[in-house]
């Protein structure tokens, strides 16, 4: 017998007369998180391709008394490919389970569990790009080389404290494009693991200056800090608590999804299918999907890796 086929023996309680409901493991699922951070688009090709382009720099002074206009050209960087990957699984319910009318009781729950598994997979893959963004041959966070040859760092290594948040906000206000021109870019989201959720809330919503040390202590201060207004109050509109961030100290400051360059492409949104297996007379189910995720440029995202 195929070990992957669910049989009536796995659900002995269902054979009892009078059973009315079957409950699988129920848990409170987090709402969809990845779409709050990524620019989510739909693709109709095998892959998507994007190119980093820098426009013009400062316009030079020109002698209009018969001299030619100075020339400039756009700068281009590397092409970034988003190659879609397929994800899927199947499961089979035996004929006996169907015949005893047991499947009618658990079929819907099994399908919901499969949908939850797919949702979990999407979140896991999407957040791994951010969580692992400090490492690799092309890191998302670090000392980045601009197309004009200069450099700009979108990474810091400070705990989520007033000092750390101030440093991150200052870095945002010092943002330069690939031509070295200062650009106005506002932080939209403070992204934290569950361990920093209340630290983030204290920083952004307390009325008075937050007393938060490097260890995340939010106890009232005896130094008189409560007499100062909180300069960080509502500076960052949204706080996002993400359980897929495994490091309990790292945190991130992002611009709005339409501003930065993190991409999520749906090639095939999750879909389910079912048919009868003529060999076993059981019912086979499947769930599949295809997508790609990554980043084109580091613009508009900042990460703090705390050792």
What are these regions (language model features)?
Residues 28, 32, 43, 123-127, ...:
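Intrinsically disordered or highly flexible coil/loop and linker segments, enriched in small
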Residues 2-11, 146-174, 186-189, 195-307:
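Sequence/fold signature of self-assembling virion shell proteins
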Residues 73-83, 167-179:
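Structured alpha-helical segments in the cores of large, soluble enzyme domains
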Residues 1-28:
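N-terminal alpha-helical "arm" segments
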């Amino acid at each position: 017998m195929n070990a992957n086929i669910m049989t009536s023996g796995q659900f002995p309680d269902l054979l009892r007369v009078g059973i009315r409901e079957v409950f699988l493991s129920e848990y409170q699922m987090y709402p969809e998180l990845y779409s709050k951070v990524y620019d989510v688009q739909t693709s109709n090709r095998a892959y998507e391709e994007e190119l980093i382009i820098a426009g013009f720099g400062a316009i030079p002074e020109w002698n209009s008394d018969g001299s030619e206009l100075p020339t400039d050209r756009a700068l281009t960087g590397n092409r970034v490919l988003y190659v879609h990957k397929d994800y899927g699984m199947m499961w089979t319910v035996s004929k006996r389970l169907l015949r005893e009318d047991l499947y009618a009781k658990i079929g819907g729950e099994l399908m919901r569990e499969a949908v939850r598994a797919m949702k979990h997979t999407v979140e896991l893959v999407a957040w791994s790009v951010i969580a692992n963004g400090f490492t690799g041959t092309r890191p998302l966070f670090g000392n980045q080389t601009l197309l004009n040859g200069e450099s700009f760092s979108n990474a810091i290594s400070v705990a989520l404290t007033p000092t750390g948040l101030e440093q991150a906000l200052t870095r945002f206000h010092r943002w330069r494009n690939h031509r070295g021109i200062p650009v106005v870019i506002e932080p939209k989201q403070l992204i934290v693991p569950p361990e920093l959720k209340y630290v983030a809330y204290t920083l952004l919503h307390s009325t008075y200056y937050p007393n938060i040390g490097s260890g995340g202590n939010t106890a009232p201060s005896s130094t008189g800090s409560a007499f100062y207004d909180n300069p960080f109050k509502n500076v960052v509109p949204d706080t996002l608590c993400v359980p897929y961030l495994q490091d309990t100290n790292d945190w991130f400051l992002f611009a709005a999804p339409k501003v930065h360059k993190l991409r999520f492409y749906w090639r095939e949104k999750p879909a389910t299918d079912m048919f009868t297996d003529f060999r076993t007379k059981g019912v086979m189910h499947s769930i599949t999907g295809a997508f790609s995720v990554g980043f084109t440029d580091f613009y508009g995202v900042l990460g703090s890796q705390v050792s």
